[in-house]
């Protein structure tokens, strides 16, 4: 569909620049003004037009209409607050629940200091950070699923 410009590698001047590692700045199509003035606005306006068109042609309700005179049996927060809601719901002392929530970022801040001698970026060569991430992910999913269940089976997820 499109035409791609390729550099002429038989040109001795270009080959000399490439040998010095200077080629990426000296051949091809410049980003200014070709991309920034012509291609990007077309893509942005096309995306906006598709979004507005879909919103006009197929309007969808966000949820059921609110009734201020009928309170639901159990009020649940948004899905991304489920783990925090589960901590506050299951811990009997609310101050302890708030401290547990504050301990999560504090614990995450200590992970780099535990592995400060390890300079690798590969997760398999950073066992402490990988273990903290995996355990945190599993606990967060476990708490999130438990928050949607009744409180008597929320900690065991109804499995035990």
Swiss-Prot record:
GO biological process: photosynthetic electron transport chain
Pfam families reported in the protein's UniProt record: Cytochrom_B_C
Keywords: Chloroplast, Electron transport, Membrane, Photosynthesis, Plastid, Thylakoid, Transmembrane, Transmembrane helix, Transport
A GO term, aspect molecular function: oxidoreductase activity
SUPFAM superfamilies: a domain/subunit of cytochrome bc1 complex (Ubiquinol-cytochrome c reductase)
TM annotation in the entry: 36-56, 95-115, 131-151
Membrane topology: Multi-pass membrane protein
Compartments, as annotated in UniProt: Plastid, Chloroplast thylakoid membrane
HAMAP family named among the record's database cross-references: Cytb6_f_subIV (MF_01344)
Subunit structure: The 4 large subunits of the cytochrome b6-f complex are cytochrome b6, subunit IV (17 kDa polypeptide, petD), cytochrome f and the Rieske protein, while the 4 small subunits are petG, petL, petM and petN. The complex functions as a dimer.
Family: Belongs to the cytochrome b family. PetD subfamily.
Function in brief: Component of the cytochrome b6-f complex, which mediates electron transfer between photosystem II (PSII) and photosystem I (PSI), cyclic electron flow around PSI, and state transitions.
Name under which the protein is recorded: Cytochrome b6-f complex subunit 4
Gene designation per UniProt: petD
């Amino acid at each position: 569909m499109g035409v791609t410009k390729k550099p002429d590698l038989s040109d001795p001047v270009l080959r000399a620049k490439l040998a010095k590692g200077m080629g990426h700045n000296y051949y091809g199509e410049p980003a200014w003004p070709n991309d920034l003035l012509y291609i990007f606005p077309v893509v942005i306006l096309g995306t906006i037009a598709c979004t507005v068109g879909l919103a006009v042609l197929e309007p969808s309700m966000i949820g059921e209409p609110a009734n201020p005179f009928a309170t639901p049996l159990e009020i649940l927060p948004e899905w991304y607050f489920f783990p925090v809601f589960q901590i506050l719901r299951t811990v009997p002392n609310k101050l302890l629940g708030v401290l547990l929530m504050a301990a999560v970022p504090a614990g995450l801040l200590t992970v780099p200091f535990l592995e400060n001698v390890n300079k690798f970026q590969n997760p398999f060569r950073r066992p402490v950070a990988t273990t903290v991430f995996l355990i945190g992910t599993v606990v967060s999913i476990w708490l999130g699923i438990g928050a949607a269940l009744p409180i008597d089976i929320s900690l065991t997820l109804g499995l035990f």
